[in-house]
């Protein structure tokens, strides 16, 4: 019985997070497109595969610049979010520069991609917080 409760809780939370992400990306399509590129590059890197980020670092940086260059949708427009979006752009551009220079080790590329991924998850976390700070 306890395992059934755990499984149902896991499924409910997974569904809730999926619905929340779809709502966020529906309100902020550029962020959704950024996520599409990030997910296809980050998850392979967890197994040591840097080929996807090497192929798509420019696209990742471009979407980060688009996200940062557009107004943040009203429900999410807070000081912490604005600051984190700028950090996302900075880390994504840094990732692209590392790849384009061609001198970074595989470990350094994976570490930078992981850092970029962590900043993205900070954006997701901030999107779930109460939105009281609009200036």
Task: Please tell me what each predicted stretch does.
Residues 1-24:
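Bacterial Sec-dependent N-terminal signal peptides
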Residues 21-58, 129-132:
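Immediate post-signal-peptide N-terminus of mature secreted/exported proteins
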Residues 30-37, 56-63, 87-94, 119:
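Amphipathic, well-ordered alpha-helical segments in soluble domains
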Residues 35-44, 68-72, 96-98:
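Acidic/histidine-rich, surface-exposed loop or edge segments in extracytoplasmic proteins
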Residues 45-48, 102-107:
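Short helix-adjacent coil turns
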Residues 51-58, 78-86, 106-115:
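Short, charged, amphipathic alpha-helical segments
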Residues 64-82, 99-101, 105:
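Short, solvent-exposed, charged loop/turn and helix-capping segments
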Residues 112-135:
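A charged, solvent-exposed segment within the mature domains of Sec-exported extracytoplasmic proteins
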